[in-house]
């Protein structure tokens, strides 16, 4: 719906998209260069985070696993550069790049309705790749159009403290886990 609204607000006449290709071509016509997915976890604890405990609102093991993966994002055709630590995948749809650094240790500026401007972490989420791939016009390494797409996740404040503690210890996870109620 957002793409249809932008097209209407921009005065771009178009037929109702009926296929993936139609949606991709409309996005190209509208001139969308980036899709930013932002999430903010606002759950908080009644008690301060104890030392050497990784606190999160969902699976600690799952979050740590995702967070230690290389940062990954959909990479648009308008991007004329590549980060010095950026790499392309050898196989797959070619819609993404990854950075040679953990996603949970890669900050990106973000915005969410409730808190406003914030930092998020460039944690790998399949949506950032599948959305970039979905809106691609053309195929392979040199399509005609693809938007950049990334996911910026700001976990609960105690999880942020847990990440700082873990990365401060060279990526060694805390001895104990705690999931907030």
Enumerate the language-model features and the residues they cover.
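Rossmann-fold NAD(P)-binding glycine/threonine-rich loop
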Residues: 1-2
């Amino acid at each position: 719906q957002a793409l249809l609204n932008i097209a209407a607000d921009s005065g771009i006449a178009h037929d109702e998209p009926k296929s993936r290709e139609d949606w991709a071509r409309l996005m190209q016509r509208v001139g969308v260069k980036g899709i930013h997915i932002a999430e903010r976890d606002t759950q908080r604890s009644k008690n301060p985070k104890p030392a050497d405990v990784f606190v999160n609102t969902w699976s600690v093991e799952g979050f740590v696993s995702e967070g230690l993966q290389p940062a990954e994002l959909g990479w648009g055709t308008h991007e004329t550069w590549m980060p010095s630590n950026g790499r392309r995948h050898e196989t797959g749809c070619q819609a993404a790049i990854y950075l040679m650094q953990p996603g949970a240790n890669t900050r990106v500026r973000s915005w969410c309705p409730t808190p406003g401007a914030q930092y998020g972490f460039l944690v790998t989420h399949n949506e950032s790749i599948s959305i970039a791939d979905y809106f691609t016009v053309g195929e392979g390494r040199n399509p005609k159009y693809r938007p950049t797409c990334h996911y910026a996740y700001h976990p609960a404040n105690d999880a942020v403290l847990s990440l700082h503690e873990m990365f401060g210890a060279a990526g060694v996870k805390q001895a104990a886990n705690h999931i907030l109620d």
